[in-house]
């Protein structure tokens, strides 16, 4: 398989993003930019599609994936409860490079392949225009780890990763070099006085 390449660096072409979004709905993989690093995305509600991510990256299946959303309605569909402290974090940092750990819905709308069987799920709303448009047009949350073969550096531009991932994903969306160049900060609100906040792209 030869990946379909879209160059959106200078101008976002909505028809091309729509084609890639349709690919997501069909269970295909899309390499796309965020403000942090590039990601390999699949429909987060489709177990078979998610499994393709692990194959493409050579990633262990016990390593959970971050779910990317474009609006709060998507979040409410997949998590059990949004507490007051999470709402404050969302209002302050979303869209942006913050992943928040939530309890996932007991109905397991998000499959175990995304969460590695955990009862929690990491979710973020990217600020990158292309990423948000891709998610919105696909109409589903997108599970997406960093775009690289496991053990290799995360990709901050397509040129760094195209050789190792071309043919492993159906679509490659080139949005130029990412702004931040680090993975998102991951946080879990344990209580109002205790936040788990590692040093990363927010600080």
Model-derived features with residue positions:
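Single conserved hydrophobic/aromatic residue that forms the stacking wall/gate
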Residues: 194, 199-203
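Active-site-adjacent structural elements in enzyme catalytic cores
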Residues: 1-195
């Amino acid at each position: 398989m030869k990946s379909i390449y879209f160059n959106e660096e200078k101008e976002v072409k909505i028809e091309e993003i729509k084609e890639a979004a349709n690919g997501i709905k069909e269970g295909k993989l899309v390499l796309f930019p965020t403000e942090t690093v590039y990601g390999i995305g699949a429909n987060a509600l489709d177990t078979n599609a998610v499994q393709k991510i692990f194959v493409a990256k050579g990633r262990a299946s016990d390593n959970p994936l971050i779910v990317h959303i474009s609006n709060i309605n998507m979040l409410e569909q997949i998590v059990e409860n949004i507490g007051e402290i999470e709402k404050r974090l969302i209002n302050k940092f979303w869209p942006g490079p913050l992943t928040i750990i939530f309890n996932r819905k007991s109905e397991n709308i998000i499959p175990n392949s995304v969460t590695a069987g955990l009862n929690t799920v990491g979710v973020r709303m990217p600020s990158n225009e292309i990423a948000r448009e891709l998610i919105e047009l696909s109409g589903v949350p997108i599970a997406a780890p960093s775009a690289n073969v496991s053990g290799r550096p995360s990709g901050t531009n397509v040129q760094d990763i195209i050789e190792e991932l071309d043919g492993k994903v159906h679509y490659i969306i080139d949005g130029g070099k990412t702004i931040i160049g680090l993975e998102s900060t991951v946080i879990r609100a344990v209580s109002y006085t205790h936040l788990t906040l590692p040093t990363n792209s927010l600080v």
